[in-house]
Amino acid sequence: MEIYKLSFIIIVLFMIHEFEEIIFIKKFIEKNKVIKDMKNELFVKKKESYPSTETTSLMIAEEFIILSTLLFIASEFRMYEIVLSLFIVYIAHLVPHIYDALRYGKFSPGSRTSFIIFPLGILIIWNVILNKEINFVIFILCVIIIGFLMILNLLFLHKISKKIDKYLQK
C-alpha cells in the first residue's frame, strides 16, 4: 500500500471513531451513571470530571492536527515506520473500548467503531509490514516514543480540560 493511501486511511478511521465518541458520550454517561455495575466503565468512572462536548471536540481537533501533520511529514519522507507507529498507537487505544463493551455487555462511545477498525487495522498493519521494507529497530523505537508522547499529550489535554471548558463558556 502506498504511504499516502495508508496515511489517508489512518486519519479517516481516526475521525470516524472520534465522531462516534463525540456524538454518544454525554448521552451514554447520563444513561449509565446511576447503574451500579457500570461505575468502573471507561467513561462513567470519570463522569464528574469529563469535559464538555465542545472541549472534547477541541481536544480531538488538536489530536487531529498533530496526527495529520505527522502523517504528512512521514509520508513526504516515505517513513513507513512512523506512519505504522502512529497507526499502532491509535489501534492500541481501541483495546479499552473493546474490553469495556465485552465486560459490560453493551456498546460504549467508540466501541462500535473499535470492533470494526481494530481487526481492519491489524490486517492493514500486517500487510504493510509484509510488503514494505521496514527497519524494525526504528519501527519499535517509534512505537515506544510516539506512544509515550501521545499518552503525555492526552494526559495534558485532560489536565487542562477544565480551563478549556471555562474559556469556552465565557
Residue ranges and their predicted role:
Residues 76-77, 98-108, 131-133:
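Membrane-interface helix caps and helix-loop-helix hairpins in membrane proteins
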Residues 1-26:
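N-terminal signal-anchor transmembrane alpha helix
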Residues 15-22, 90-101, 147-162:
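Transmembrane alpha-helical segments that form the membrane-embedded catalytic/substrate-channel core
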Residues 88-97, 108-129, 149:
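Hydrophobic alpha-helical membrane segments
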Residues 55-73, 116-122:
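Core segments of transmembrane alpha-helices
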Residues 21-49, 160-170:
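Cytosolic, membrane-interface loops and tails of multi-pass inner-membrane proteins
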Residues 122-170:
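Terminal transmembrane helical module of multi-pass membrane proteins
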